[in-house]
Curated annotation (Swiss-Prot):
Residues 143-147 are annotated as: Interaction with TRAF2. It comes from Mus musculus. Residues 153-158 are annotated as: Interaction with TRAF6 1. GO terms for cellular component: mitochondrial outer membrane; mitochondrion; peroxisome. GO terms for molecular function: signaling adaptor activity. PANTHER family: DUF3504 DOMAIN-CONTAINING PROTEIN, MITOCHONDRIAL ANTIVIRAL-SIGNALING PROTEIN. Residues 431-436 are annotated as: Interaction with TRAF6 2. The modification Asymmetric dimethylarginine is found at residue 234. Residues 356-365 have a biased composition (Basic and acidic residues). Residues 10-77 form the CARD domain. Residues 145-166, 178-189, 371-387 have a biased composition (Polar residues). Following activation, phosphorylated by TBK1 at Ser-418 in the pLxIS motif. The phosphorylated pLxIS motif constitutes an IRF3-binding motif, leading to recruitment of the transcription factor IRF3 to induce type-I interferons and other cytokines. This is Mitochondrial antiviral-signaling protein.
Length: 503
């Protein structure tokens, strides 16, 4: 960082409140001096801590890049912040050495910048403007990459699809040299020609538009360095007609890329011929595999298998328009005998790329295959488990439910259930029946109102009641004896006085 850039950074840091109006997400696409990883981190910080705190990280990342002041001033003018741009320009020019030409800052004073940035334009060589200062159109500049990016595979793929010769690709520098990505891109157009129907073979140019080209905004390394997407290839795998009975002499040659494209026209004609043969062979119901089998040759783990390497698997080729994940078609499920080999049912899976072969093998259900081969009893594995549970064992809760109409009084100890084996046809519930019978004897005795709230058992309350009856009967006997004794004494005294008076 130069002296003028250091002083400019200190000015921005001391006057940070003036720059709070700068929107980080709006100005990021125009800061071409920042790398894509820096812009990704700033966007993540913007979502977490907001715009005001992210400005500190933005200025810290800017001051580590050479020539950041001129880029920042240009970005401020594009974002319609001319006041801040003039302040930064004045401070930056004041610390520059005398006599320094500011050729890069002269276009910034011209008011020919549009207010809004135009959308993404078509990627064409004629639209490129030579770099002479900052007089180019104010479109979003390409961010600085962390590492040296490889040559764009999108441009090479467009030229390969349009010319269909593919021997030489034009690089970004303008020189004509063999493309390093040509061999990796060659199987895709040939595969698209083989998977399409014969009448749609000439419409391969429409697939060029399916590859999006983003020419605006920063692109992270994980997005900008990815290979070509294979969406068009997977769409053709699902919508195209499965052509599996091709001759072995038309296998894909990986020795030279030019010969692979030279065979493209011949492969289309052979694919049309083989498609007509598969329509005639699909009428028959023979399950004898063809004696001529060609082993599958995998060229690379990232390249899809050519459908020509799966030549002549069986003579009963299903003419299904969309290859299903099931091993066999539902139309032929009833006609295939049980002795059909497993290779016949799993043959259509070879037309899928190798990276999807292992996944589809795991996702393939085994239910339809067993129905075709066995054709017998289709009882599931749960039938053996259900047969283990006998009738009395399943009806055990019914015995307990029948006693719910009676009042219940017991503790948690009385509810212990004896262990019983579910495999025994007649389980023994002796301890439970004895406990429940004791409950029935206790419940039949209607308890009194005084004993309902008592926690003690009924048997301990009965002797106490008998003692109370005996204790209550003792005073009445004593009073009766005392009264009879007094009455006898009174009668004796009266009798004695009557005799004395008579004498």
């Amino acid at each position: 960082m130069t002296f003028a850039e250091d002083k400019t950074y200190k000015y921005i840091r001391d006057n940070h409140s003036k720059f709070c109006c700068v929107d980080v997400l709006e100005i990021l696409p125009y800061l071409s001096c920042l790398t894509a990883s820096d812009q990704d981190r700033l966007r993540a910080s913007y979502r977490q801590i907001g715009n005001r705190d992210t400005l500190w990280g933005l200025f810290n990342n800017l001051q580590r890049r050479p020539g950041w002041v001129e880029v920042f001033i240009r970005a401020l003018q594009i974002c319609e912040l001319p006041g801040l741009a003039d302040q930064v320009t004045r401070v930056y020019q004041s610390y520059l050495p005398p006599g320094t030409s500011l050729r890069s800052l002269e276009p910034l004073q011209l008011p020919d910048f549009p207010a809004a940035v135009s959308g993404p334009s078509a990627f064409a060589p004629g639209h490129n403007i030579p770099d002479h200062g900052l007089r180019e159109t104010p479109s979003c500049p390409k961010p600085v990459q962390d590492t040296q990016p490889p040559e764009s595979p999108v441009e090479n793929s467009e030229q390969l699809l349009q010319t269909n010769s593919g021997a030489v690709a034009r690089m970004s520098g303008g020189s004509l040299i063999p493309s390093p990505n040509q061999q990796a891109l060659s199987p895709q157009p040939s595969r698209e020609h083989q998977e399409q129907e014969p009448e749609l073979g000439g419409a391969h140019a429409a697939n060029v538009a399916s590859v999006p080209i983003a020419t605006y905004g920063p692109v992270s390394p994980t997005v900008s360095f990815q290979p070509l997407p294979r969406t068009a290839l997977r769409t053709n795998l699902l919508s195209g007609v499965t052509v599996s009975a091709l001759s072995a002499d038309t296998s894909l040659s990986s020795s030279s890329t030019g010969s692979a494209f030279a065979k493209g026209a011949g492969d289309q004609a052979k694919a049309a011929t083989c498609f007509s043969t598969t329509l005639t062979n699909s009428v028959t119901t023979s399950s004898v595999p063809s004696p001529r089998l060609v082993p599958v040759k995998t060229m690379s783990s990232k390249l899809p298998l050519s459908s020509k390497s799966t030549a002549a698997m069986t003579s009963t080729v299903l003419t299904n328009t969309a290859p299903s994940k099931l091993p066999s078609n539902s139309v032929y499920a009833g006609t295939v005998p049980s002795r059909v080999p497993a290779s016949v049912a799993k043959a259509p899976a070879n037309t899928i790329p190798p990276e999807r072969n292992s996944k589809q093998a795991k996702e393939t259900p085994e239910g339809p295959a067993t129905k075709v081969t066995t054709g017998g009893n289709q009882t599931g594995p749960n039938s053996s488990i259900r047969s283990l549970h006998s009738g009395p064992e399943m009806s055990k809760p019914g015995v307990l439910v029948s006693q719910l109409d009676e009042p219940f009084s017991a503790c948690s100890v009385d509810l212990a259930i004896s262990p019983s084996s579910s495999l025994v046809s007649e389980p023994n519930h002796g301890p439970e029946e004895n406990e429940y019978s004791s409950f029935r004897i206790q419940v039949d005795e209607s308890p009194s109102a005084d004993l309902l709230g008592s926690p003690e058992p009924l048997a301990t309350q009965q002797p106490q009641e008998e003692e109370e009856h005996c204790a209550s009967s003792m005073p009445w006997a004593k009073w009766l004896g005392a009264t009879s004794a007094l009455l006898a004494v009174f009668l004796a005294v009266m009798l004695y006085r009557s005799r004395r008076l008579a004498q």
